[in-house]
């Protein structure tokens, strides 16, 4: 059980009588508790308090008119704890005892009535607590299952979409591969065609060179024929001029065979042309082989680069697909987290509202308990004073030797209420009563701080003021 700290505050007031005697001593005790104090039968205390208010406040009205004048007042044993009357008793001691007996009977009847009402209120409060139904949060389990099914379907659909996107990307990659191969073959074809065109140009140049050489040979042949013809003409002219007059014998070298020389020159030129043709053909073949080797190596390098590019593209596409899948998963998880946070925040708000309501109810119940505890202590104090008064009445009933004077006061004298702690002072008929003194109130407040059944501190404050 939690430690309770209660600070009781006791107020004690005394009221002086109108004839110079104490008309009664009022002691009002109240408790100011810090925390929660628990008293037995709180519901009964509440009923007892409410009934005590209605019952005790009307004790003054239950007295007969013959005993009290119109100026008689009662405090209901709550304010001052006693009663005083400005009228006078009209009767003997027997009538006074009868009045006190009637008052005691009324008080006992009121006590029984309060006990019955207390029991009734306790039963009603118990029934009310039994019929209270606690707040139950709604069950969302069925909705959670439906949401999980939809989430599974969404994940399956997302995986199917990712698979279709992967297939589409693979088809695009295959199309890119075929396009790249086509472009490679087209570039190779263009290179070969360019080489063929270059070789054709070289062949045309060689053909032109051959035609030039043939033209030069033909011109040389024609020049040789012209020279031969001119030589023969000159020889014939000289022969005609000399005739038979001169017989010249020339011992000269044998004549040169021009046909043989031309044939030799032709053979030399043909050999030279053949050598040039062979050299050009060898150079062309060498250049072609080198170019083919360069083309092959370049094509191999290009093929390797294209293969690497294709692999990198596939890797990039796969990574992009995985990134999209991760983004979609992250978005779904974020949405799920947001929904979960919203749901739990709403539930938390409901729980907080419920907790606030319960705390408000607890604070109200605590305030009611404190108020009922204070009223209960007040009623206990009233009960103690009433028991003392009953004991006083019993003492008055048993001791008949103390009697009132036979004749009332000649002047308007106020009656004296007998209290065990203060002896009664009757009025003297031959001496007029002095004027009534002022009535004063002395309030003594004792504040004690109690924790775990031990008194920690105690303070006393006395305040006097006239009425």
UniProtKB/Swiss-Prot annotation:
Cross-referenced SUPFAM superfamilies: Intermediate filament protein, coiled coil region (SSF64593), Prefoldin (SSF46579)
IF rod domain: residues covered: 93-404
Superkingdom per UniProt: Eukaryota
Annotated stretches, region: Coil 1A: 94-128
Tissue: Expressed in the hair follicles.
GO cellular component: cytosol; extracellular exosome; intermediate filament cytoskeleton; keratin filament
Region listing for Tail, in residue ranges: 401-467
Region (Coil 1B): 140-240
Any Pfam family the entry gives: Filament
Region (Coil 2): 257-400
Keywords associated with the record: Coiled coil, Intermediate filament, Keratin
An annotated Gene Ontology molecular function: structural constituent of skin epidermis
Stretch list, region Head: 1-93
Keyword Coiled coil: yes
Ranges where the record places region Linker 12: 241-256
InterPro entries xref list: IF_conserved, IF_rod_dom, Keratin_I
Annotated segments matching region Linker 1: 129-139
UniProt site positions, description: Stutter: 342
GO terms of biological process kind: epithelial cell differentiation; intermediate filament organization; regulation of keratinocyte differentiation
Keyword Coiled coil set for record: yes
Assembly information from the UniProt record: Heterotetramer of two type I and two type II keratins.
Record PANTHER family: INTERMEDIATE FILAMENT, KERATIN, TYPE I CUTICULAR HA6
Family, per entry: Belongs to the intermediate filament family.
Note: There are two types of hair/microfibrillar keratin, I (acidic) and II (neutral to basic).
Protein name in UniProt: Keratin, type I cuticular Ha6
Organism: Homo sapiens
Gene expressing this chain: KRT36
């Amino acid at each position: 059980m939690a430690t309770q700290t209660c600070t009781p505050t006791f107020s004690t007031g005394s009221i002086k009588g109108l004839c110079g005697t104490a008309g009664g001593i009022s002691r009002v005790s109240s408790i100011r508790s810090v925390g929660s104090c628990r008293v037995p039968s709180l519901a009964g205390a509440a009923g007892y308090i409410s009934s005590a208010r209605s019952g005790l406040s009307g004790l003054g009205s239950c007295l007969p008119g013959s005993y009290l004048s119109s100026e008689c007042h009662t405090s209901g044993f709550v304010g001052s704890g006693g009663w005083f009357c400005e009228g006078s008793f009209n009767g003997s001691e027997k009538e006074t005892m009868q009045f006190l007996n009637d008052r005691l009977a009324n008080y006992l009847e009121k006590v029984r009535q309060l006990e019955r009402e207390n029991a009734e209120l306790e039963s009603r409060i118990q029934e009310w607590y039994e019929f209270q139904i606690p707040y139950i949060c709604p069950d969302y389990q069925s909705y959670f299952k439906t949401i999980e099914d939809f989430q599974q379907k969404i994940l399956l659909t997302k995986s199917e979409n990712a698979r279709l996107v992967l297939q589409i990307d693979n088809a695009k990659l295959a199309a890119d591969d075929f396009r790249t191969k086509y472009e490679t073959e087209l570039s190779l074809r263009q290179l070969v065609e360019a080489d063929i065109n270059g070789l054709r140009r070289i062949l045309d140049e060689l053909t032109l060179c051959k035609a030039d050489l043939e033209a030069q040979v033909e011109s040389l042949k024609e020049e040789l024929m012209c020279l031969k013809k001119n030589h023969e003409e000159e020889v014939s002219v000289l022969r005609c001029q000399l005739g038979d007059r001169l017989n010249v014998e020339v011992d000269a070298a044998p004549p040169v065979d021009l046909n043989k020389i031309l044939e030799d020159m032709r053979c030399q030129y043909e050999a030279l042309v053949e050598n040039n043709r062979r050299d050009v053909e060898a150079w062309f073949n060498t250049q072609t082989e080198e170019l083919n080797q360069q083309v092959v190596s370049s094509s191999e390098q290009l093929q390797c680069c294209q293969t690497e590019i294709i692999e990198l593209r596939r890797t990039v596409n796969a990574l992009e697909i995985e990134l999209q899948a991760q983004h979609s998963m992250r978005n779904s998880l974020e949405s799920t987290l947001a929904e979960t946070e919203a749901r739990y925040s709403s539930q938390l708000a409901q729980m907080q509202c419920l907790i606030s309501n319960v705390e408000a109810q607890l604070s109200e119940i605590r305030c009611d308990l404190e108020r009922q505890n204070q009223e209960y202590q007040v009623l206990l104090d009233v009960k103690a004073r009433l028991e003392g008064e009953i004991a006083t009445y019993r003492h008055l009933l048993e001791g008949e030797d103390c009697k009132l004077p036979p004749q009332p006061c000649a002047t308007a004298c106020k009656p004296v209420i007998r209290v065990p702690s203060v002896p009664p002072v009757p009025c003297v008929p031959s001496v007029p009563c002095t004027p009534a003194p002022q009535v004063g109130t002395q309030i003594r407040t004792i504040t004690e701080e109690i924790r775990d059944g031990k008194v920690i501190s105690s303070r006393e404050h006395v305040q006097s003021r006239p009425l």
